[in-house]
Amino acid sequence: MTTFSPREIVSELDRFIVGQKDAKRAVAIALRNRWRRQQLKGPLRDEVAPKNILMIGPTGCGKTEIARRLARLAGAPFLKIEATKFTEVGYVGRDVEQIVRDLVEVGIGLTREEKRKAVKAKAEAAAESRILDALVGPTASQATRESFRKKLRASELDDKEVEIELAPSGSQGMPMFEIPGMPGASMGAINISDMLGKALGGQRGKPRRITVAEAYAPLIAEESDKLVDDDALTREAIREVEDNGIVFLDEIDKICAREGRSGADVSREGVQRDLLPLIEGTTVATKHGPVKTDHILFIASGAFHVSKPSDLLPELQGRLPIRVELQPLTVEDFKQILTATEASLIKQTVALMETEGVTLDFTEDAIDALARVAVEVNGSVENIGARRLQTVLERVIDEISFTATDRSGETVPIDAAYVRDRVEDLAANADLSRFIL
């Protein structure tokens, strides 16, 4: 779990996301509050509930990107999922409790990685012994083994093929048994594929011929897992999920009930009703054991351009007490997105062309022109936010990208005139840009 201060979290998000200070502050405070709660002692710790967040903002303004970057920062079980994937309990499809089951799998993966790091040295020694057995046989003399061990450590045998037996992970090698309309689903807490895999003896490994270099990673993972207590790992992962789990529910505006619509609404209001106990705090049965959701942080986000936040069920609104409004992007924001972020679009484009030996030289007025065209098209056609920049930029460098292989060693200047020449006629014609930009 991260111990960054709210200021450090915001500055980390600033490296990749332009503007949206309010949203960054809200998620930074929420993340820090997880750590603060851990410092409390006694019954008060159980009483402190997370303050769930609802992020409201137009498409392409950075809601999902904040979630992606937060996942890397959190150092805790984090799941990003779309609310539109679920249907009401009792209908074909995934029910919302699958969110918690997926989060537990993420938590187990994170905890397993930590445990593997702790036993890495022992696992590497065991993997090396297995590779030596495959190379020279278990009955070889100590001198022969030591000779091969030296070559192995000097990477001289990396290309040599060996035959090793690897245990399949989970139900690998077994056909997938799925309930129609519910991919990867569980019947209650039991995963059908896992159950049938065990019943049909799917745990036996098959010998495989692979190179020594390729054998290391799976063997180290397998030997690490032998040294790790699975039951203790699962208990620790569930505890981590219950205390520090974060769920990012995207596209929540798409499950608002539409006015004037009648009939079954199995993936809208029904899903909202099912989310209520999950967000408030309930116990979900998973194949690893029961999981309490009382202290899982939920961050919901939506564009709300067709519906309004007030269209959500009042009970659900009450369970998302912190509202953050993200602002539409301006010309200045677009210029920052093109140049200022750590992996900006201009840096990406220049780096891609350099692989062909072509140097792109974007002038200041070219960047200004790109930003203005994107804003104009967003205003006249459909506002898709920062995603519009990718469309405009691709159109500008389309010709260079196509002929780059023949222009190795060239430096191509891109100025405002070049940008206007490529896109302005389309940007000016609203009907054309509706289909092309």
Swiss-Prot record:
GO terms for biological process: protein unfolding; proteolysis involved in protein catabolic process. GO terms for cellular component: HslUV protease complex. It comes from the Bacteria. Keywords: ATP-binding, Chaperone, Cytoplasm, Nucleotide-binding, Stress response. One of its GO terms (molecular function) is ATP binding. ATP binds at V18, G60, C61, G62, K63, T64, E65, D250, E315, R387. It is found in: Cytoplasm. A double ring-shaped homohexamer of HslV is capped on each side by a ring-shaped HslU homohexamer. The assembly of the HslU/HslV complex is dependent on binding of ATP. Belongs to the ClpX chaperone family. HslU subfamily. NCBIfam families: hslU, PRK05201.1. ATPase subunit of a proteasome-like degradation complex; this subunit has chaperone activity. The binding of ATP and its subsequent hydrolysis by HslU are essential for unfolding of protein substrates subsequently hydrolyzed by HslV. HslU recognizes the N-terminal part of its protein substrates and unfolds these before they are guided to HslV for hydrolysis. This is ATP-dependent protease ATPase subunit HslU. It comes from Methylorubrum extorquens (strain CM4 / NCIMB 13688) (Methylobacterium extorquens). The gene is hslU.
